[in-house]
């Protein structure tokens, strides 16, 4: 499924827990709160040049909303949310929703479906090459003096006499937009509007995430 026709949901990472199968196996899952997703704008081919649904999640004080955004939301008749995202969809999908309509989780996801989850990874601060790029440490002894966790040589010979751009070195790690692909939906809680996804997803507790139908789901299933 391509991004051009996949409606997703915005949510907040609640935390992790585990579920038990009928066989007694423990399955680690991440709980995502996807309640209160509502449409702020329906974009059409005639008016905007492409078809999409603009969705907001959560709630925010009116004093925290910029004037342009406040006018946009007032026109839609929608309460201000904490984040706004846009999903490219088909004209058929866009026709199912009107401005201000709620998007329940059962409309988008089902148990066993593959999803991609995008969020902001946990910031780790300044990190070395071992942690940042998964490089191997050097020898602990046997002639190694104070060079255990250094990257080693970073340069070339006299020609070209410089470090090439893109060389993996130390630097800031984390706090970046990250996507984890092909995760399984284990449970859909319609009553509480919760999505239980197998495994870990990017970000810390309370962080915002975007959940979409998996882009590479068909390719991965066909490979098996």
Curated annotation (Swiss-Prot):
Keywords: Methylation, Ribonucleoprotein, Ribosomal protein, RNA-binding, rRNA-binding. Pfam families: Ribosomal_L3 (PF00297). GO terms for biological process: translation. GO terms for molecular function: rRNA binding; structural constituent of ribosome. The lineage of its organism: Bacteria, Pseudomonadati, Pseudomonadota, Betaproteobacteria, Burkholderiales. This is Large ribosomal subunit protein uL3. One of the primary rRNA binding proteins, it binds directly near the 3'-end of the 23S rRNA, where it nucleates assembly of the 50S subunit. PANTHER family: 50S RIBOSOMAL PROTEIN L3, LARGE RIBOSOMAL SUBUNIT PROTEIN UL3C. The keyword Cytoplasm does not apply.
